[in-house]
């Protein structure tokens, strides 16, 4: 699927299913622009709460479902905004912050 069309569908899904105050980033090769046709879509979902519950990980499911329907692989990492800020020293955090595109 065309990149802009897929980003649009991800945004529409996010607006439909995510709680208020959430932030969704696209990162990795799709954000940097050095992707290939079989590259996956890496999403980082930040929820506006101090700590996640097991149920919060379910917010990633609609994006996986969108991937199945679109014949694309979508991987969603879920963190609370506080937990994400606590990872500021990690290479993963630094890579995401460098590459990210804010979707919502």
Which residues does each PLM region occupy?
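Catalytic core of pol beta-like nucleotidyltransferases
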Residues: 1-25, 32-37, 47-104
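Short beta-strand->loop micro-motif that forms the acidic, two-metal-ion catalytic signature
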Residues: 42-46
């Amino acid at each position: 699927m065309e990149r802009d069309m897929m980003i649009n569908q991800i945004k529409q899904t996010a607006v439909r299913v995510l709680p208020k105050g959430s932030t969704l980033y696209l990162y990795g090769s799709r954000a940097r622009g050095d992707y290939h046709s079989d590259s996956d879509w890496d999403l980082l979902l930040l929820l506006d709460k101090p700590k996640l519950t097991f149920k919060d990980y379910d917010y990633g499911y609609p994006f996986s479902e969108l991937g199945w329907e679109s014949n694309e692989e979508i991987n969603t990492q879920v963190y609370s905004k506080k937990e994400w800020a606590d990872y500021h020293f990690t290479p993963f955090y630094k890579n995401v912050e460098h590459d990210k595109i804010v979707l919502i």
